[in-house]
Amino acid sequence: MLKKKYILYLLCCLLLVGCGRAGGASLSAAQIKKTLTADCSFTAEFTYDTVEGCATVEKAGEVFSITLTEPEVLTGLAFVLGPEGSQMIYGDTVIDLHDHTIHEEALAAILERTFAGTDELTVTRQNGSILATADCTFFHYTVILSEETGYPTAVSVPELSIEILISDYTPAGGTL
């Protein structure tokens, strides 16, 4: 009788252990939105059509600041996107982006939309990462998050040929 109880106990333990997820817990859409809407800073390496570059990005409240650090010819070009309006700044030149549709603005707008957290997300797991996909009217985007930290590591917008690798992601205050 004791042997049967022991085997039953061992079987239950093995079943419970088998139910655990390898590589950390999955994140819900609500948790991902909380991460995306949090104040943060990071480095973004991007490919947009034939343009490759790098930018520093800061999000504070509803204001999103993007400053290009590469390519060299665009170093210092900045975008400030917010609820009161958006601007492109280069040196002493400031352009309000009310009705302008320039190539670089689309990249900035994608980052702003992704980190606004307003789109419904479908969450899946693939190859040790968490994928959060949003379907918008004219395109869809996927945010890839680390299972280990829950922080975003990439954004992909296939219809617009935009790929963004995120590094040095730092939430304001150090942690979420």
Describe the predicted segments one by one:
Residues 13, 17-60, 73, 98-100, ...:
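N-terminal leader/targeting segments and the immediate start of mature chains
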Residues 39-40, 61, 81-84, 126-128, ...:
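A short, compositionally biased
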